[in-house]
Structure formats: C-alpha cells, structure tokens
Amino acid sequence: MPKQDRAIRTRRTILVAAASVFEEHGFQAATITDILNAAGVTKGALYFHFQSKEDLAYGVMAAQGRHMGVVPPRACKAQEVIDTVLLQTYRLQKDPMVRAGVRLAMDQHASELDRGTSFQDWGKGMTLLLDAAKEQGELLPHVVPSDTADLVVGAYAGVQSMSQAVSGYTDLNHRTSVLLRHIMPNVVQSSVLTTLDLAPERGAAIYAEIQALMEAEELAGASA
C-alpha cells in the first residue's frame, strides 16, 4: 500500500476511534490513552496526525460536518431546508462520527473548544437556503432568513439533545417532524406549505438518494 494511502487510512482509523470515545465519555473525561486503545495505533502515529486531544476533537467535528452530506438541490428551497434537517436526523441515528461531533458541539464542559463554529456553519448554510427561498417568493413577508436559520438550528439542537437523553435518538424522527410542522407554517407561504414533505421517514430516503448519486458518479468516473 502506498505511504499516502496508508497515512489516510491511519488518520481515518484514529478519527473513528476518537469519535467513539468522545461519544461515550464526552470531551473532558476522554483520554488520549482511551483513543489509542480504541484505534490500535502507536502514540507516534496518533501525534503525527493530531497534536492534542483538542486537535482530535476538532478533527471529529470537521469530519461530522462532511459526513452530514449535502442534500441534492431542490426546486423548492423550503423543501431543501427541511431535507437538510431530516438528513441530519438520519445521520445522527446511523453515523457515530456525526453523533460524536454533535456531542462535542453540545458539551458545555468542553471549555477548551470553540464549540460555536458548528452552529454558525450550519446557520450560514440555512441562511443561504432561506435567502434563496425568499427570492423565489416561498417565504412569508415578515421572515428574516438569518433569524429563522438561527431559530431552526437552535430549536433542533434542543430537540436532538432531548431525544438523545430520553430515547438514545430512537424517537428523533418523530420529534423532528413535529418541530418542522410547528415552525414551517410561520415561515412559508400557505401555497408552498401544502407541497412540503415533512414525513419522519424522509431522511432515510434522502440518504439513499445521495448514496445512489455517489455510486452513479463513481461508475461514470470509472468508465470515463
């Protein structure tokens, strides 16, 4: 195996191990020794890629952002907002890296970390979608996209945190759908509202859609 490929695989192994440890113990209680044991790598290999526990945490948080995936563009941007939230819901239930990144962002004991970046990045993405929705006439006149984006991100953070505590995310689909059913009527035009799909199971369908698109791209690249 080429050195570069081996280094990429080692870095990935360390991040997956760190995600597992951070998800289970939180940032403060997690130790480098725990992560080394979970990864099965040497201390030298770990420190080649990550300089500290904080560096590892930022690596996990960045990776969970990439793992969230990007919803394929929708003609209706309000639906794209909804799909972004529902895809995150599915990822939280299925992807340990996403769960670990969210736990780190929500961990009030992790005072050493800049936890606000995750929320700000998601808020910026939501604002762009809502700006596009407003340009297309999908939003009610009073809606300020940046304010609504912050509301959606903050409310969702609370809902997912409650779901994690109460059911280990097993009821997050339902809770997310309820949240969206309460928010969207105050955000979008009634003519748009009737077209929106807020079904709890939609997140899984979006994930399958993304996987199919990725596989098609890989096949196209292989045959080129």
Language-model features and meaning:
Residues 88-142:
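Short secondary-structure transition hinges
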Residues 59, 69-98, 149:
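Hydrophobic alpha-helical connector segments
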